């Protein structure tokens, strides 16, 4: 469950290391984002010579949350940290690699490029 001011790790090689959510997209009163939702983020920490710089405002897809994800079969999946992948306006990832596992709920939200780049889909 991601809301405004939430800090997230970046799970790609775009150059950003930490980002902060500044808006949850999808309605004027929407407060929370879950896995697969698109948020607007500000880059808080970046590596030198990366594609993005500190202070850049980007869109990102939430790929991991510490809050439980409930599945229709009754199982529950949760991660140790909150993580996102930076995307452009066409929802294509900015980085060329994804680090760490991603849940298969991303497939239902049509983030196929992220699924194909991920090393493991849970």
UniProtKB/Swiss-Prot annotation:
Keyword Metal-binding (UniProt): no
SMART domains from the UniProt entry: Ribosomal_L14 (SM01374)
Disulfide bridge positions per record: none
GO molecular-function terms, A-Z: large ribosomal subunit rRNA binding; structural constituent of ribosome
InterPro entries assigned: Ribosomal_uL14, Ribosomal_uL14_bac-type, Ribosomal_uL14_CS, Ribosomal_uL14_sf
Record keywords: Ribonucleoprotein, Ribosomal protein, RNA-binding, rRNA-binding
GO biological process: translation
Superkingdom: Bacteria
Signal peptide: none
Gene Ontology cellular-component annotations: cytosolic large ribosomal subunit
Pfam entry (one): Ribosomal_L14
Protein family (similarity comment): Belongs to the universal ribosomal protein uL14 family.
Function: Binds to 23S rRNA. Forms part of two intersubunit bridges in the 70S ribosome.
Subunit structure: Part of the 50S ribosomal subunit. Forms a cluster with proteins L3 and L19. In the 70S ribosome, L14 and L19 interact and together make contacts with the 16S rRNA in bridges B5 and B8.
Protein's UniProt name: Large ribosomal subunit protein uL14
């Amino acid at each position: 469950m991601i809301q405004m001011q939430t800090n997230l790790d970046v799970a790609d090689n775009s150059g950003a290391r930490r980002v902060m959510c500044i808006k949850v997209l999808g309605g004027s009163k929407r407060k929370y984002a879950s896995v697969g939702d698109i948020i607007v983020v500000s880059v808080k920490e970046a590596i030198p010579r990366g594609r993005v710089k500190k202070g850049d405002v980007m869109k990102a897809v939430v790929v991991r949350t510490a809050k439980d994800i409930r599945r229709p079969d009754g199982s529950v999946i949760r991660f140790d940290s909150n993580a996102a992948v930076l995307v452009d306006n066409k929802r294509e990832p900015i980085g060329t690699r994804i680090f760490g596992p991603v849940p298969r709920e991303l497939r239902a939200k049509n983030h196929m490029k992220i699924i194909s780049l991920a090393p493991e889909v849970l």
